[in-house]
A protein has these predicted regions:
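Conserved acetyl-CoA-binding loop-helix of GNAT-fold acetyltransferases
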Residues: 8-17, 130-132, 136-153, 171-176
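A short beta-loop-alpha structural element at the N-terminal edge
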Residues: 31, 72-84
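Helix-loop element at the rim of GNAT/NAT acetyltransferase active sites that forms part
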Residues: 86-92
């Protein structure tokens, strides 16, 4: 079940009883203002996460977009599935090529980004990866710019993405495109019994 509350009394009611009955906690994932009280409360019950990932939430409004020349960045196709899977280190069956935007240099996939969510108003970017041999060359910025331009042209008004706190190079490139840091997000993963 999902708990979104900053009210500690309500949190205790919603979490303590299910935990006492043996409910296994797998993950707490939410904006930090909701997730942190839950994670801290679970720690008081001696349920500690294996790992915590804190991310900044970056938001881009269409009117703030500072697009750049994207070179040959393009949407993915079925023919690209294997190279997308290789760069993303995922199984090919998990790749949805039409949600991917790709940048190739000399027939090598050097950067990619994809859509994690889409509504009439918003798009959420994820899976931004630049090949380790091609980092700090602007390829990630180009592929994200192409993706943003595509969805703004489709009528969406805002883009959203999550960036780990320690990924300073990515934060800089998103800010150059017009993204603003607007919130914090926390994911806490727990061991399965």
């Amino acid at each position: 079940f999902v708990v979104h509350t900053e009210d500690l009394d309500l949190l205790e009611c919603l979490v303590k009883e299910p935990v006492k009955t043996g409910l296994e906690i797998e993950c707490v994932a939410a904006f930090e203002r909701f997730a942190r009280p839950t994670v801290d409360f679970l720690k008081e019950l001696n349920i500690k996460p294996e790992q915590e990932h804190e991310s900044f939430v970056f938001q881009l409004k269409k009117e703030d977009f500072q697009g750049i020349e994207c070179g040959d960045a393009r949407p993915g196709t079925i023919a690209d599935i294997s190279v997308i899977a290789d760069l993303g280190q995922v199984e090919a069956s998990r790749v949805t090529p039409e949600r991917e935007f790709l940048l190739f240099q000399e027939d090598q996939l050097v950067a990619k980004a994809n859509i994690h969510g889409l509504s009439d108003h918003f798009f959420q970017i994820g899976g931004v990866i630049t090949h380790e041999d091609h980092r700090r060359k602007g390829y990630g910025q180009k592929v994200v710019s192409k993706l943003c331009q595509h969805y703004f042209d489709q009528g969406q008004q805002e883009g959203l993405l999550f960036v780990l706190h320690d990924n300073v190079p990515a934060q800089k490139l998103y800010k150059k495109l017009g993204f603003l840091q607007t919130d914090n997000f926390l994911i806490a993963n727990y061991a399965k019994n």
